[in-house]
Amino acid sequence: YEGNETAIISIGSVSGGGASESGTQSVTITITENESAPTVTLTVSATSIAENAGSSLTLTATLSGKADEDVTVTIGTAGTSTEATDYTDGSGVINDMTISAGNTSTTANFTPTDDSVYEGNETAIISIDGVSGGDASEDGTQAVTITITENESAPTVTLATSATSIAENAGSSLTLTATLSNVADEDVTVALST
């Protein structure tokens, strides 16, 4: 796809028969594009991925037809997960994706961060926020939702005491300690009862 193009044809020189150019002579011809302007779609290789080290998915931005210049696809992120904390492109944030002139697709990695914090399953919504170059546009609203499945166990709470008996005198005390089996991503409140 190149869009409509123009060709300007002019007289370069005239020779023979005593003829000469009458002023500056040129004609403009419009070449009407017969291809539709390309549209961009966004897909992902799977909609769920475990938070295990080394796992990744492939995001693909695809043009419906070739463009004669680079097409830049601006990426947006949302969901319950946080880009650069819960996932990256393997080295950092998922940047704009560029489909080079003459090509129809480009890819980016989606790599979850394997941490030791229990967060539960999280979602990442990767969307197209804009398209520029090659007269291309987004095909409707393009977004993919990825579930990052938690690989840590939900934390459990244990209760311990510094002593099992205490004197009833003034100033006597003992310490109760509530311990989580692993780190949680939010405060955990332990309500005590007697």
Language-model segment annotations:
Residues 1-194:
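Short boundary segments that mark the start of a structured unit
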